[in-house]
Regions:
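Conserved RecA-like ASCE P-loop NTPase motor core of nucleic-acid helicases/translocases
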Residues: 119-123
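Conserved Walker A/P-loop ATP-binding site and its immediately adjacent core
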Residues: 124-130
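Peripheral, non-AAA+ core regions of ATP-driven protein-machinery
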Residues: 3-6, 10-13, 17-79, 86-94, ...
Length: 452
């Protein structure tokens, strides 16, 4: 007798279930997130309870073997993962279409096969011949790498357990199907149940599973928010498709820090690691041009020097235009307001454009002072010396507030050959005197801009 179907509404954000449509989700309070799905009555979930009885174990009895991490052969990826792949982990890799998610995982598979690690690549989007063509294009010619083209979770689970694979790639989670659920691939129910099945396989057999997830136009992984809660690690692949740089950022990691990023560059032969991001981002920077400054952004534990550009010109509109690329728009408006109120600069009749060169996105407030310098430099047509790096957060009272890891940032500037660093006075450290960099300390925005 066939199972009956019924209509259920699910919240796309948190997976909350309701018998009727609601404008606001009672679970996560998000608006207009309910979608209608057909589910079979009686199917409570795809995850089966283990048959064997289990008993609790004391924490001191649990052993963590040194070999529990497997190196991927990519230093930048290992950095984000916390030192390598943990056996039995479930890792979600998200990013925009064409950003390089499948490419980095294929290159990782190649390196793992070289270490005699059994790898299985499962694709629900491409045929085996298409996967092979893409692999050959980026130089992956590994005869021992197993490929599977299927989207049925029952078949995939059977193959995983029989293949003796230690690492499995699922590309992508939105194409996989649990037949018992009875809804279309990519729906909230399917994504949740497929993830639950994969999590059970990973934990039961000690297999590391990487899941590729597509993102929505808002930049979130498509599917319920519970997907990110279920997995062990969430990695986001960021970057501008018009630029070669790619940033792999960890937003969740149960086995390591989330304060790390990996920097790559996209080439014709795939992704290449960037050992010195500061040098790569500053390469080709124009010299002796107003509105251009170098700032230090702390990405995880790694200081990265980037070029910040500003262009200020008279407006032809009643309301001046404010545009920012790679930096928070509201932050730029805040800095402009402080410059008008505390410094006395008349910026109302001028358009202001701020850009982070190289396609980078910066969220560090330590670049505030650099934004102010770039705007003042362009406004007054005065050049900031190309061998000067600027660090500091701007408060609403016009004070320059201290930021974190200034000594580490100054060391990076010294390594890159900079002659001067402008820093907050509260961040001065005697250890900076040993560097080959002149340290200029400032406490207010007026004092800082007087150096221009």
């Amino acid at each position: 007798m066939a199972a009956k179907e019924k209509q259920i509404f699910f919240c796309k954000e948190c997976g909350y279930e309701s018998a009727k449509w609601q404008g606001q989700c009672p679970g996560c309070r998000a608006w207009n997130t309910f979608v209608e799905e057909k589910v079979k009555v009686g199917v409570k979930g795809a995850v089966k309870q283990p048959k064997d009885a289990v008993s609790p174990m004391g924490i001191l009895q649990v052993t963590t073997a040194e070999e529990s991490r497997v190196q991927t052969g990519m230093r930048e990826l290992d950095r984000v993962l916390g030192g390598g792949i943990v056996k039995g982990s479930l890792v979600l890799v998200g990013g925009d279409p064409g950003i390089g998610k499948s490419t980095i995982l294929l290159q990782m598979c190649r390196n793992l096969v070289h270490q005699n690690v059994n790898v299985l690549y499962v694709s629900g989007e491409e045929s085996l011949s298409q996967i092979k063509m893409r692999a050959e294009r980026i130089g992956v010619f590994e005869k021992d790498m197993l490929l599977l083209c299927d989207n049925d979770m029952d078949n995939i689970e059977r193959v995983i357990t029989k293949s003796n694979a230690s690492v499995v790639i699922i590309d992508s989670i939105q194409t996989m199907v649990v037949e018992e659920v009875g809804s279309a691939p990519g729906t909230v129910t399917q994504v949740r149940e497929v993830t639950a099945r994969l999590m059970q396989v990973a934990k039961q057999y000690g297999i590391a599973i990487f899941i590729v997830g597509h993102v929505t136009k808002e930049g979130n992984v498509a599917g319920p928010r519970t997907l990110e809660h279920m997995v062990d690690s969430v990695l986001y692949f960021e970057g501008d498709r018009n630029h070669g740089f790619r940033i792999l950022r960890g937003v969740k990691n149960r086995f390591g820090s989330t304060n790390e990023i990996g920097v790559f560059t996209m080439t014709e032969k795939g992704l290449e690691e960037v050992d010195n991001p500061s040098q790569a981002l500053l390469n080709g920077r124009p010299q002796n041009v107003s509105g251009s400054v170098v700032v230090s952004s702390l990405e995880g534990t790694r200081p990265i020097l980037v070029e910040l550009q500003a262009l200020v010109c008279q407006t032809n509109f009643n309301m001046p235009r404010r545009t920012s690329v790679g930096i928070d728009y509201n932050r730029v408006n805040l800095i402009l307001a402080v410059m008008e109120k505390r410094v006395g600069m008349n910026l109302w009749g001028y358009d202001a454009y701020v850009n982070i060169a190289g396609g980078m996105k910066v969220n560090d407030t330590a670049v505030d002072l650099g934004v102010a310098f770039a705007i003042a430099s362009s406004m007054n047509n005065k050049v900031v010396p190309s061998d000067t790096m600027i660090i500091g957060e701007i408060g609403l009272a016009g004070e320059i507030r201290g930021v974190t890891n200034v000594l580490q940032r100054a060391k990076e500037a010294d390594k890159m050959g900079f002659a001067t660093c402008i820093i907050p006075k509260s961040n001065y450290d005697k250890a900076m005197d040993k560097l080959n960099v002149k340290i200029l300390c400032v406490s207010t925005l007026v004092e800082a801009l007087s150096l221009l």
